[in-house]
């Protein structure tokens, strides 16, 4: 399991811890990952994802998982999230078509 957010693509960063005397020590900065279950309103089911705390706030800000995935860029998403995005877009298209007829 990689240390990468499935929704935003945030991953491990490498840098230095710098002391007062300016000595540098290599350090890994890990993302704040959480295992969460999010509700998809369009698919009417729950989805388990491994996301950062920052991504959770973004999902809430955009109005839920469906709205977040529709606006998200494909490059940042994991394979699971890409498949989920396609399923949501198909379901929304299906529900919009009969209403127009």
UniProtKB/Swiss-Prot annotation:
Belongs to the bacterial ribosomal protein bL28 family. SUPFAM superfamilies: L28p-like (SSF143800). Pfam families: Ribosomal_L28. One of its GO terms (cellular component) is cytosolic large ribosomal subunit. This is Large ribosomal subunit protein bL28. Keywords: Ribonucleoprotein, Ribosomal protein. Signal peptide: none annotated. One of its GO terms (molecular function) is structural constituent of ribosome. GO terms for biological process: translation.
């Amino acid at each position: 399991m990689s240390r990468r957010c499935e929704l935003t693509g945030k991953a491990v960063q490498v840098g230095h811890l710098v002391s007062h005397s300016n000595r540098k020590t290599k350090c890994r900065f890990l993302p704040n990952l959480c295992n969460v279950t999010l509700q998809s309103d369009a698919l009417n089911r729950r989805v388990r994802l491994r996301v950062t705390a920052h991504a959770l706030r973004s999902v809430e800000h955009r109005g839920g998982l469906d709205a977040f995935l529709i606006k998200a860029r494909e490059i940042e998403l994991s394979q699971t999230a890409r498949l989920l995005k396609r399923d949501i877009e198909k379901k929304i298209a299906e529900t919009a078509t009969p209403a127009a007829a």
